[in-house]
Regions:
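Catalytic glycan-binding domains that act on GlcNAc-containing polysaccharides
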Residues: 1-119
């Protein structure tokens, strides 16, 4: 759908550790929602693209795994385009634009991808 490598989203999900119904509240007042732990900062952009109110988008991200994963794919694709095709930078951006946090997250996702290939 978004021309992403097949293990990209499953590897991110393995690191995020989210699930249907999960909301993780952050110190900055935002929350991470559902299977892919999509941050509430994305509610506005997703609402504009999908043309649904933010509250409906939020409920769907929390309660509908397929919707959540599709949204995560769109987010990763956005970052991949922003990073001119650099998948590792895009994966790090999915978590944080702070360099140290970005790099640490990339390492975790690479490790998760390696585990997925050895199953």
């Amino acid at each position: 759908l978004y021309h992403l490598p097949p293990r990209a989203l499953p590897s991110i999900q393995a690191v995020e550790g989210g699930a249907v119904g999960v909301e993780h509240f952050n110190a900055n007042g935002s929350a991470d929602l559902g299977v892919m732990q999509i941050n509430t900062l994305w509610l506005g952009p997703l609402s504009q693209v999908i043309r649904q109110p933010r509250e409906i988008i939020r409920r769907r991200l929390v309660g509908e795994s397929c919707f959540n994963i599709i949204a995560a794919g769109a987010i990763l694709r956005t970052y991949l385009d922003n990073e001119k095709g650099d998948l590792l930078k895009a994966v790090g951006d999915y978590h944080s634009h702070t360099p140290a946090l970005n790099l640490d997250y990339r390492r975790k996702v690479i490790a998760a991808a390696m585990r997925l290939t050895t199953r």
